[in-house]
UniProtKB/Swiss-Prot annotation:
Organism: Burkholderia mallei (strain ATCC 23344)
Enzyme class: transferase
EC number: 2.7.7.6
Family indicated by similarity: Belongs to the RNA polymerase beta chain family.
Subunit description: The RNAP catalytic core consists of 2 alpha, 1 beta, 1 beta' and 1 omega subunit. When a sigma factor is associated with the core the holoenzyme is formed, which can initiate transcription.
Keywords: DNA-directed RNA polymerase, Nucleotidyltransferase, Transcription, Transferase
Gene Ontology MF: a single term: ribonucleoside binding
GO cellular component: DNA-directed RNA polymerase complex
GO BP terms, alphabetized: DNA-templated transcription
UniProt keyword annotation of Ligase present: no
Name of the protein in its database record: DNA-directed RNA polymerase subunit beta
Catalytic activity: RNA(n) + a ribonucleoside 5'-triphosphate = RNA(n+1) + diphosphate
NCBIfam families noted in UniProt: PRK00405.1 (NF001616), rpoB (TIGR02013)
Length: 1368
């Protein structure tokens, strides 16, 4: 087995029983693939498929003018490279985007040409079409300097759907069937039955009309309509009664209304008897062709065709007329012999279309189309052209109606056609097929669709959403272009005069900036980033709304298996509407979710992997991943647990067609990170998944000792770590950069054989947490492609590490851990285990005001020396300054207008001169409740304004850093070149050279070492070929130098050009504060099993319960938090964590004893290879084994994969290995070694019973008490009621509500109550009076009228009630 550089350092022991058949796919693939398909940037123009931008362009172009003599054609498009890179965009608040240019061709036709059109002139030109935001390599977008994610949308697939109302519409509970044709864009077409069984249609949920109007409008006559939906009975009229053609199927189950006889007149069925199968056999045996029926059998039947008098041509009766005695008489008079009637019955052949025709009052096609026009455009006069145009535009025009590939495929599948392609508009037979199926459903044949089935819901990804917006922008452009194309010839316009890119830019900007699906990226930790990008939402434009979504949509559906996670979804109003993709899920070309399965052939499981969509999966029998398999791959058990069409059952192995890929297939990334998930209740697992996303990165991340084995995948795929792009040797490492000399076989000829990785240092994330990368390689290390070189936030040796491993004791402790409170040892705080760094960004802008420009300066009057001491000469705080609430960070003064001066001010001005009063101090100060260290300052200056010294210094530092990078590259490139040169020159014969090298001398190493490197090029070689090579190497080095100089110039130009700032802003300064947050009471913490709580007390180490060897517990949790919540996984995690740490202590003790390597190998083999997945320790050298052992001292990391984890036997084996009997005896453990005798830290007495003790990975969540704590003395008031505002953000007060008032009333504390309701709240005059009294030393309250009472009076008056206060 191949181990990567970081895996070798610390192997996670896996308890998985199954081998890895299929690797977890790249977790951000959905986003990245979707967007690259949209752009097709790297695809040559000729090979671009019709999707994304290409599809949008080809669907709108060519644009033809109204007169038809000018048209604008689309040729191709190209994307330029972005002006700024991602980091620069984030710093400057710009969008990371690329300019889109389209090559278009203007074709003008000759108006004079008599017959066919002749091209008069062609103009081709590249036109700017706006900016398209680009996706970063990690699947996010940088919009206006902040990272955003476009969430995928789960919406109803285009196609046709059949459903019924479940009997809710009509009081009788009758099922009313309906069908709906949903296009990708265009009008919806609904068909529905009413309680009287008449079939109606409606367009876009407008007024309903009988469906036959639509059928007539598409050109069918009533006769054709009936022929499409009914079978006919044939009658031959006799003088008395009639002969009916005998069709056996139609009689079965009917009650005979007369005696049925055979040819000889023998009675086969008596009157009023039900006709059964025997009667039909007898009739068939008698070779009955016709049955004689009495006259009244015909009455009430419905004619299928118009009946015309052969002689006169007069219509005697119309199709769909009921036969009455009068009609029969007319038929006989006209000597009509043959008639056809509709065959209907009550069971499976209802007269629905016939009854609908009776309701329909339109006569022909024109009348029907006019009726539809009136419904769509009420009040407009229907002219013939308008009527035709509207009807064709509804379903037949490609501009207005598009079923899309998916819609056509789904439609054809549903109506039972074989081909899955076809026209993208509706056809007449599509409408007929839909109505036929709907009538069949009403007749009791067939099934309605399940709209929550994932075969009927598809995912719209970034690419598709962006394409829709882009198309919308293009359509707006098309309208404008059409107007102007007419003047193109007369005014000699070029393509760029016709196209205005504003509508496109604004559509794209609006989508990326403010669409419901474009969200501010959750960047608390790497897991929250990945989960956000894998989120699937049913909300958003064209989706559901929270209020309207019922229970069914939110529920877990059998088709979610392996596609959407059944666990991870938010609590609250969005539950079930926002989901997460399952671990292996993948989108197919139509946007349906697929999941992988292993093929099973003849009861043998193969390694062939097939991705199946929800529709395909329904056809197969699929075994679960935990089915027992023999060595030859055969299914062993007699009965295997399996699923078919959503039902779970036990079947024999020969019926199995597929098998799950992995047990973790059904859950999402976050849920698959929970060890022992299978032992947790679903609700708690949901909380666990959601809370892992809120874990704050700790200062020193620590890998979980009990994981699930997916931690490395998550850390690497999230992009928070730094991975080697190419293999090589580490040439240089410091805290900020890693330089790697690339292996020769991976370096491309003529290119720099060096990779430089600049690490991200102390950068602010979207949630103000700290992103910081730390190198984990040393100089000289050999790394391969894909190896982790540096850890990011919340990663430890390339594994996700969200929290810390805490020694946990489950026991009550003096009520301090009552109701989920958490008791924590002071040592945890002292060791900075849960200390996190948060970075706050504070901005100040200097604007140009009416009274003159604001100025950023150090020169501020009446500012204390202490405050000024922190500012440099430009008035900006130094980096490294420690600041507290109220301290000045950036000095700024604003000019203020002349005011009427008081005598005191006049005196001051006379003494101190003018300066003091014409400006006011508007400096940037640290907000209340915040303190920290300044770690970075950025200054942005508008073009054309003099930079201050600080801004210049920042630019110089940046250039210096860049020059360092270039010098490094050059040093390695030259080193590499000179090594190659030396190998080439040694042993060659020279014709002369520096230091008087004689002709014919062989060059040796000593001679070269004696020469300066650059003089090697002056050696004249005898061998011409070698001389040419020497020249080539010299040229390539000079070329590289030239390239580097150009790159440096480019960078300098970028840095020294003015910054784009909002209008009116001259200068902007951003100050970054690093705030250190230690753990304190009130902080929220949680495990991974939904076991959350709040820190109630931090206890001195000496008071914590401790073990016999003096080790105190870190955390004490209440055992009552486990049984009722049914998240037993936490207890199992604690047991396994206890074993993991115990093994680590044993390895540490062996290393301390300096045990032989062989003994270490044996012990490690016992741990890794006795159970679960075996590891290949043989391939490790002794040094590697030693390094591995050193890294395991803090605990052997375990992986217990979801649904395939450690068993109780394996856990007890590990506990036995970790705690031999002598240690167990010393700690007074129970026989199963998972409980320990603890002693009370305060008294030293042992507790009565042993306590469950072990290690749990515990997280500190983002809900920190520092962010919630808030106090106010005076502050802002509400405008109308004059009461203090509420909430921390508004610096508001605490609400003294209704119940609090009752409490004071109950105590009779009338004075306290009075001041609460008046001067402390909204008595405006009273408030100022109190201040006045206090200043005078007179402690009296004059309570007046609360302002809210005046508001109430005004409100009563607004109701027209005259109310006045009698102020006596």
């Amino acid at each position: 087995m191949q181990y990567s550089f970081t895996e070798k350092k610390r192997i996670r022991k896996s308890f998985a029983k199954r081998s890895i058949v299929h690797q977890v796919p790249f977790l951000l693939a959905t986003q990245l693939e979707s967007f690259s398909t949209f752009l097709q940037a790297d695809v040559p123009t000729a090979q671009r498929k019709s999707e994304g931008l290409q599809a949008a362009f080809t669907s709108v172009f060519p644009i033809v003018s109204h007169n038809g003599f000018a048209r604008l054609e689309f040729v191709s498009y190209a994307l330029s490279s972005p002006a700024f890179n991602i980091k620069e965009c984030q710093q400057r608040g710009l969008t990371y985007c690329s300019a889109l240019r389209a090559k278009v061709r203007l074709v003008l036709l000759d108006k004079e040409s008599p017959s066919k059109p002749v091209v008069k002139e062609v103009k081709e030109q590249e036109v700017y079409m706006g900016e398209i935001p680009l996706m970063t390599p990690t699947g996010s977008f940088v919009i206006n300097g902040t990272e955003r994610v476009i969430v995928s949308q789960l919406h109803r697939s285009p196609g046709v759907f059949f459903e019924h109302d479940k009997g809710k519409t009509h009081s009788s509970g009758k099922l009313l069937f309906s069908a709906r044709i949903i296009p990708y864009r265009g009008s919806w077409l609904d068909f529905e039955f009413d309680p009287k069984d008449v079939l109606y249609f409606r367009v876009d949920r407008r007024r309903k009309m009988p469906v036959t109007i639509l059928l007539k409008a598409i050109g069918l006559t009533p006769e054709q309509i009936l022929a499409n939906f009914f079978v006919f009975d044939n009658f031959t009229l006799m003088d008395e009664g009639a002969q009916m053609e005998f069709v056996p199927e139609r009689l079965r189950g009917e009650v005979a209304r007369f005696d049925i006889t055979d040819r000889e007149g023998k009675v086969i069925v008596q009157k009023d008897k039900r006709i059964n199968a025997k009667h039909i056999r007898d009739l068939e045996a008698a070779k009955t062709k016709y049955i004689s029926v009495p006259e009244d059998y015909l009455l009430g039947r419905v004619l299928a065709k118009n009946v015309v008098d052969g002689d006169t041509g007069e219509v005697i009766a119309n199709a769909n007329d009921e036969i009455t005695e009068g009609v029969l008489e007319k038929l006989r008079e006209a000597k009509i012999k043959e008639i056809q009637t509709l065959y209907t019955n009550d069971l499976d052949q209802g007269p629905y279309i016939s009854s609908t025709l009776r309701v329909d009052e339109t006569v022909d096609k024109t009348a029907a189309r006019i009726a539809i026009y009136r419904m769509m455009r009420p009040g407009e006069p229907p002219t013939e052209e308008a009527v035709e145009a509207l009807f064709n535009r509804l379903f037949y025009s490609e501009d207005a109606y598009d079923l899309s590939k998916v819609g056509r495929m789904k439609f054809n599948r549903r109506v039972g056609r074989d081909e899955i392609t076809g026209p993208m508009t509706l056809q007449d037979d599509d409408i007929l097929a839909t109505i036929k199926i709907l009538v069949e459903l009403r007749n009791g044949k067939g099934e309605v669709d399940d709209i929550d089935h994932l075969g009927n819901r598809r995912v719209r990804c970034v690419g598709e959403l962006a394409e829709n917006q882009f198309r919308a922008g293009l359509v707006r452009v098309e309208r404008a272009v059409k107007e102007r194309l007419g003047q193109a010839e007369s005014e000699n316009l070029m393509p760029h005069d016709l196209i205005n890119s504003k509508p496109i830019s604004s559509a794209i900007r609006e989508f990326f900036g403010s669409s419901q699906l474009s969200q501010f990226m959750d960047q608390t930790n790497p897991l929250s980033e990945i989960t956000h990008k894998r989120r699937v939402s049913a909300l958003g434009p064209g989706g559901l709304t929270r209020e309207r979504a019922g229970f069914e949509v939110r529920d877990v559906h059998p088709t979610h298996y392996g596609r959407v996670c059944p666990i991870e979804t938010p609590e609250g109003p969005n539950i079930g509407l926002i989901n997460s993709l399952a671990l292996y899920a993948h989108l197919n070309e139509y946007g349906f979710l697929e999941t992988p399965y292993r093929k099973v052939v003849d009861s043998k499981v193969t390694d062939q992997i097939d991705y199946l969509s929800a529709i395909e999966e329904g056809r197969y029998m699929i075994a679960q991943a935990n089915a027992a398999i023999g060595d030859d791959g055969a299914l062993v058990d007699e009965l295997v647990s399996s699923r078919e069409a959503g039902e779970t059952m036990m079947v024999t192995p020969d019926r199995i067609q597929y098998m799950d890929v992995a047990p973790s297939q059904i859950v999402s990334v976050a849920a698959s990170l929970i060890p022992f998930l299978e032992h947790d209740d679903a609700n708690r697992a949901l909380m666990g998944s959601n809370m892992q996303r809120q874990a704050v990165p700790c200062l020193r991340p620590e890998k979980p000792v009990v994981g699930t084995g997916i931690e490395r995948t998550v850390a690497v795929d999230s992009g928070t770590t730094v991975q080697a792009l190419r293999g090589g040797v580490v040439d240089y490492v410091d805290a900020g950069r890693i330089v790697i000399r690339v292996n020769d076989d991976e370096a491309v000829a003529g290119e720099v054989g060096v990779d430089i990785y600049n690490l991200i240092k102390y950068t602010r994330s979207n949630q103000n947490t700290n992103i910081n990368q730390r190198p984990i390689v040393k100089m000289g290390d050999k790394v391969s492609r894909g190896d982790v070189l540096a850890d990011g936030a919340s990663t430890d040796l390339g594994e996700l590490a969200l929290g810390q491993n805490m020694l946990i004791a489950f026991m009550p402790w003096n009520g301090y851990n009552f109701e989920d409170s958490i008791l924590i040892s002071e040592r945890v705080v002292a060791d900075d285990r849960y200390t996190s760094i948060h970075i706050e960004e504070l901005n100040v802008v200097a604007r140009d005001t009416k009274l003159g420009p604001e100025e950023i300066t150090r020169d501020i009057s009446n500012l204390a020396e202490v405050q000024l001491g922190r500012l440099d000469e430009s008035g900006i705080v130094y980096i490294g300054a420690e600041v507290e609430a109220g301290d000045v960070l950036v000095g700024k003064v604003t000019p203020k207008g002349e005011t009427q001066l008081t005598p005191e001010e006049k005196l001051l001005r006379a003494i101190f001169g003018e300066k003091a009063s014409d400006v006011k101090d508007t400096s940037l100060r640290v907000p209340s409740g915040m303190s920290g260290t300044v770690i970075d300052v950025q200054v942005f200056t508008r073009e054309g304004i003099q930079r201050d010294k600080r801004a210049q210094q920042i630019i110089d530092d940046e250039l210096k850093r860049y020059r360092l990078d270039l010098n490094d590259q050059l040093r390695i490139v030259e080193g590499d070149a000179f090594q190659r040169l030396a190998r080439m020159l040694v042993g060659k014969v020279a014709n002369g050279g520096p230091k008087k090298l004689a002709k014919g001398t062989k060059i040796d190493q000593a001679y070269l070492e004696d020469l300066d490197h650059y003089h090697w090029f002056d050696i004249r070689l005898a061998d011409d070929e070698a001389a040419v090579q020497l020249e080539a190497i010299k040229n390539s080095i000079e070329e590289k130098r030239h390239q580097f100089d150009l790159a440096f110039e480019e960078k300098r130009k970028k840095l020294t050009q003015g910054d784009e700032l909002p209008p009116g802003v001259l200068k902007m300064v951003k100050v970054y504060l690093a705030v250190k947050r230690r753990l304190q009471p009130g902080d929220k913490m949680a495990g991974r099993h939904g076991n959350k709580g709040v820190v109630s007390k931090i206890v001195p180490v000496e008071d914590m319960p401790y073990m016999a060897d003096g080790r105190p517990a870190d955390v004490v949790l209440n055992p009552l938090g486990v049984p009722s919540r049914m998240n037993v996984g936490q207890v199992l995690e604690v047991h396994l964590g206890w074993a993991a740490k115990g093994l680590g202590w044993r390895i540490g003790e062996m290393l301390a004893r300096q045990t032989k390597i062989e003994e270490l190998r044996v012990f490690l083999t016992k741990i890794y290879n006795e159970s679960g997945r075996a590891e290949d320790l043989e391939s490790f050298s002794d040094d590697e084994i030693l390094e591995l052992a050193k890294n395991l001292r803090e605990g052997v990391p375990f992986a217990t994969p979801v649904f395939d984890g450690a068993t109780e036997e394996e856990m007890s084996k590990m506990l036995d290995l970790a705690f031999p009997d002598d240690i167990a005896e010393q700690l007074d453990m129970n026989p199963s070694k998972n409980q320990v005798r603890l002693y009370d830290g305060r008294t030293g007495e042992p507790f009565e019973r042993r306590v469950t003790v072990g290690y749990m990975h515990y997280l500190k969540l983002h809900h920190l008490v520092d962010d919630k704590m808030h106090a106010r003395s005076t502050g802002p008031y509400s405008l109308v009621t004059q009461q203090p505002l509420g909430g921390k953000a508004q610096f508001g007060g605490q609400r003294f509500g209704e119940m609090e008032v009752w409490a004071l009333e109950a105590y009779g504390a009338s004075y306290v109550l009075q001041e609460m309701l008046t001067v402390k709240s909204d008595d405006v005059t009273g408030r100022t009076k109190v201040y006045e009294n206090l200043v005078k030393g007179d402690h009296v309250i004059d309570a007046g009228m609360p302002e809210s009472f005046n508001v109430l009076v005004k409100e009563i008056r607004s109701l027209g009630i005259d109310i006045d206060l009698d102020r006596n």
